[in-house]
Amino acid sequence: MNKDNVKLAIAPIGWTNDDMPELGSENTFQQIVSEMALAGFTGSEVGSKYPRDPAVLKPMLDIRGIQICNAWFSTFFANGQREKTIDEFVNHMNFLHAMGANVIGCSEQSGSIQGLDKPILGDAKPCFSEEEWQRVAEGYNTLGRLAAEKGMQVCLHHHMGTGIQTTAEIDKFMSLVDERVFLLFDTGHAWYSEGGEAPMLAILKKYLPRINHVHLKDVRPPVIDQVRRDGLSFLDGVKKGTFTVPGDGVIDFRPVFKLLDDFGYKGWMVVEAEQDPALANPFEYAVKARKYIRETAGI
């Protein structure tokens, strides 16, 4: 891949999980970002342990050569929380802008079961009505406009357990929003939802012109099989090892890197692979991911 076009980041979720704070509670902010830098990454997304004052956070990252590239934002347009979502988005956007980021990754969380004790591979996930889809589209178009006014871009993170998870749901969303709304492509969630590498790559191919942020996440099919068989929740699956870093699971990332490179993708690729840090040492797995990307993507 072209080193001038692509930057590599890693998410803190491998060290400490915001949805399950007991996982990695012993890992401090300074340890996390120091290990990111030591593993060879130059970017990070934002976790719950990160200071939210740019004047405090930025110097602590600068000394380690780390930039903030994104931070998760939950939207609630489908269930009618438009004004509250937009107000909170503006504050979130201003924080990211102050940190030098230009991408804002959002997930539509209305009815989401990703944090609930419900089977993630059952039929409990939300399915939006036409009215709800229109609310979501109108809301995201508003966020896209607000971000553009700041010289930034909004992207939708398709995610297990949400109303925008499957290929069909991604297609529906992308058909309704305007050109100022982009897609955050996540290899692990695409594979998990659609059950294989071919449909995962099909999403990537179809939306290459609209993808402005990439999450690199590998999967362990035997764990996914157990999740399906035992009716486990998303978070129970995470604790058992549904996800891992690139090079440690079943996904061959070389076609992913080639598609992005051939298209001329410019932006961040973020290793975002949540698992139990007591079972998968975060620093060791960060080093493993960095080595794999160096060997397969040439960066």
Swiss-Prot record:
* Entry keyword set: Cobalt, Lyase, Manganese
The cofactors named for this UniProt entry are:
glutathione; Co(2+); Mn(2+)
Give the EC number(s) under which this enzyme is classified.
Answer: 4.2.1.44
Citing just one GO molecular function, the answer is:
myo-inosose-2 dehydratase activity
> What's one Pfam family the UniProt record gives for this protein?
AP_endonuc_2
Its EC top class is lyase
SUPFAM superfamilies the UniProt entry points to = Xylose isomerase-like
Superkingdom assignment:
Bacteria
Family matches, as HAMAP family: IolE
Name recorded for this polypeptide: Inosose dehydratase
- Tell me the organism: Klebsiella pneumoniae (strain 342)
The gene that this protein is the product of is iolE
